[in-house]
């Protein structure tokens, strides 16, 4: 990983790994490579690939369900194995995707290539929105959500709302399959403290806008009621606002 990149570097791939709200600023620093490298995003939420593609010519979008826990500055702990998917977003060919897949395999990350990355992004968004805000507000690791019947009921209802929005947006998703996938991800990352929970623990800004906010915005566009997602969005934003007031 690099925070500063020599302007004469010639990377084949650049992975943008910032929080979603920092993507635009990251691309300002990386614009010298816009025509030289293939940019890769596995970030949470929607909108990252679009933001990157406004600067970079070639973009790969993807999703991953690997769980990671922040241990300290410059130190993270791998807390769960999950599926990784990659697909072409802008001016990327099959050979580029295969090369990236093989590169990831070399470092122990098994990735699959998909021809429908937009559906995968929406699927990951539904999973994320069904786990992250609940874990953050209940202050529990992912596994507790599926062991607690009350929290599991909330997860299933949030997932149901979000899936309806994903379908309206054109994603080829199935409600039962996504519910099963969400529960499986929570079990596989049972010990992981969701990124949104880690952010709130440190009184940092969360990615609620790119995750649940994307669902609420799309739901309004399609006039689909999503009361639970809207409530979770409002509650997490309220927690963020409380931190800002306390630090003022």
Task: Please give the residue ranges for each predicted region.
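A general structural signal for well-ordered alpha-helical segments in protein cores
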Residues: 11, 23, 48-49, 97-100, ...
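A generic hydrophobic-helix recognition signal that picks specific residues
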Residues: 12-15, 121, 132, 196, ...
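NAD(P)-dependent Rossmann-like dehydrogenase/reductase catalytic/cofactor-binding core
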Residues: 156-248
């Amino acid at each position: 990983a690099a925070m500063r990149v020599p302007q004469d570097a010639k990377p084949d791939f650049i992975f943008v790994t910032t929080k979603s709200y920092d993507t635009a600023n990251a691309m300002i620093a990386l614009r010298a490579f816009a025509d030289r490298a293939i940019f890769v995003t596995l970030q949470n939420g929607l909108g990252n690939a679009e933001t990157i593609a406004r600067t970079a010519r070639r973009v790969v979008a993807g999703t991953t369900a690997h769980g990671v826990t922040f241990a300290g500055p410059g130190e993270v702990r791998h807390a769960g194995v999950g599926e990784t998917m990659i697909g072409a977003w802008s001016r990327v060919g099959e050979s580029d995707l295969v090369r990236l897949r093989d590169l990831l395999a070399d470092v122990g990350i098994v990735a699959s290539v998909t021809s429908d990355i937009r559906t995968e992004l929406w699927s990951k968004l539904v999973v994320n929105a069904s786990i992250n805000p609940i874990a953050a507000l209940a202050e529990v690791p992912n596994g507790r959500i599926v062991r607690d019947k009350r929290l599991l009921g909330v997860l299933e209802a949030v997932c149901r709302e979000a899936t309806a929005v994903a379908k309206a947006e054109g994603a080829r998703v199935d409600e039962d399959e996504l519910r099963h996938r969400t529960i499986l991800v929570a079990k596989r990352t049972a010990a992981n403290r969701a990124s949104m929970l880690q952010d709130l623990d440190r009184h940092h800004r969360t990615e609620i806008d790119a995750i649940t906010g994307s669902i609420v915005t799309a739901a309004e566009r399609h006039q689909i009621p999503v009361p639970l997602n809207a409530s979770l969005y409002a509650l997490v934003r309220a927690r963020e606002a409380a931190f800002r007031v306390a630090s003022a």
